[in-house]
């Protein structure tokens, strides 16, 4: 059984590693796309929207609903990518906790 001091050292080490992984993730860009890639939403790994791009074909004043739907698809796609990357990157720490 580990003594308390070793457990604290291991926990601090894991915390630093986790903070680095979080910083790496925040510095990564994720681009979600709608059907036919007509709308692209780009986020940072900490879920900050940095850009939305609309291809000309999707901009129709007579059909705003399609633009809204495609924008929602692109945003949700990017957020799903971020969630998956977060689980992959930080999920490994759950099993390493010393307690």
From Swiss-Prot:
Molecular function per GO: DNA binding
Main localization (coarse): cytoplasm
Keyword Cytoplasm: yes
Keywords for this protein: Cytoplasm, DNA-binding
Cellular compartments annotated: Cytoplasm, Nucleoid
Pfam families per UniProt: YbaB_DNA_bd
Key word Cytoplasm present: yes
Gene Ontology CC terms, in alphabetical order: bacterial nucleoid; cytosol
Annotated InterPro entries: YbaB-like_sf (IPR036894), YbaB/EbfC (IPR004401)
Family that this chain belongs to: Belongs to the YbaB/EbfC family.
Function noted in UniProt: Binds to DNA and alters its conformation. May be involved in regulation of gene expression, nucleoid organization and DNA protection.
Subunit structure: Homodimer.
Name used for this protein in its record: Nucleoid-associated protein SZO_16661
Organism field: Streptococcus equi subsp. zooepidemicus (strain H70)
